Amino acid sequence: MRYLVICITAVLAHMSLTIPYYAWAQTQPAGSAPSGYVLVEEDVIVTFANEPKKSFRTAVGDFLNRQMRAAAAEIRKGAAYLKLEAARASGDAKKVLIDSVQELEKLANDVQKAAVADLKELQNAFARAEYALARHHYLKAVELRAKGDGQKTGRELQAAADYVDSGQVWLTQKMHEGVSDVVNEARLVSAKMVYGSGAAADEVGRAFEGLGKELDKFGSTVGTLKK
């Protein structure tokens, strides 16, 4: 069973998660975390997959209200969650997440200094961050599907679908019309997998194929955004 060793800088309050800043992935038995750290199952982390998008949307509201310090704090929350996900990612997915973390941290600093005038800078950075998360969760789902773990596969597929969907909020142009149907199909299949209600192999395959194509289109659009 995989765990994340996490430095205790996180708190849960009012159903909102502040993500710890330092984390690294470990494969080890429970109880072996060093002093000042906790050992958290990866499954627990996935349950908070929606936190970055909440922070990003709150940051936009704060930015528009000229509450720059508050906006910067929300951007840092999102960046910290991406750093946490990067700790359990690998290969190119890890690099894309880390690149996004660095972009968000710089953006937060600039916002706090009132050095950002254009909302589009936030929107573009958030689109890249949500693409990085969507791709990461999708690749995790592919990995877990190959291992035959239906429930965990479903959770990761759900998170990937959510970020393919919510990431469109930040794009300067809408993705093509059929994306909602693909996302909804992936969500339906993922729910069946999570709750064990019997997702057929062919519908699982279609969900992965369809979402993978939408993810590629999302990535192509994000690649054209100005940094």
Predicted regions and their residues:
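Positively charged n-region of N-terminal signal peptides that target proteins for export
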Residues: 1-4
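Sec-dependent N-terminal signal peptides
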Residues: 6-11
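C-terminal segment of classical bacterial N-terminal signal peptides
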Residues: 14-22
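Long, charged/polar, soluble alpha-helical segments
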Residues: 24-227
